[in-house]
Amino acid sequence: TVYIDDEAVVFGSIYSPGAKNVKIFGGGVLDNSTEERITEHCYENHTKGTFRIYNCENIDVSDIILTNSSTWALSMFDCKNIHIDNVKIVGHWKYNTDGIDVVNSENVLIENCFIRSFDDTISIKAIYDYQKPIQNITVDNCVMWCGWGKNCEIGIETDGIEYKNIVFKNCDSSTNIQLISSKFIVPFSKFSCRYSRSHSVKCV
């Protein structure tokens, strides 16, 4: 268990490979402003961002604030049974500052979150490294506000086996939504998007 007191500001990041049955909560701030900033693609240069997990199961993150991320603020790779609830993300670093990235993961619920990011707010993607399906992903009752990116994007990285049972609902979006953008041939099934307010929805 990781508890961040609601009056605390912690400078650093959370990084975990292979963790199980972890709860992270508390209402405080996790500030990533001390991590090195680079102007190239941060993922390729091993910058971790504020919160990154690999191959994890049964992770619950609630009520914390993530800010000033050097790259994707909250990202998960090859994870399952992840619950993100009432998390606030604020980041204006203009290079690769996605809000939440769900990569080759399954059984993920993201709800009641506020995300202000310069790049994509929520991005669901698959990369060649894992070659696993991405399935059972729900985004519910979230407020999303991006800069030059997209709100709720599926892609552009779609190098996976299958996308299945993905739902966006009851969300407020500040700008356009790019639902599907693929450079690979990938099967999609059971996809649903029900927004309360947004400017436009686009599938490409």
Language-model features: locations:
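Extracellular/periplasmic carbohydrate-active domains that bind, remodel
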Residues: 1-204
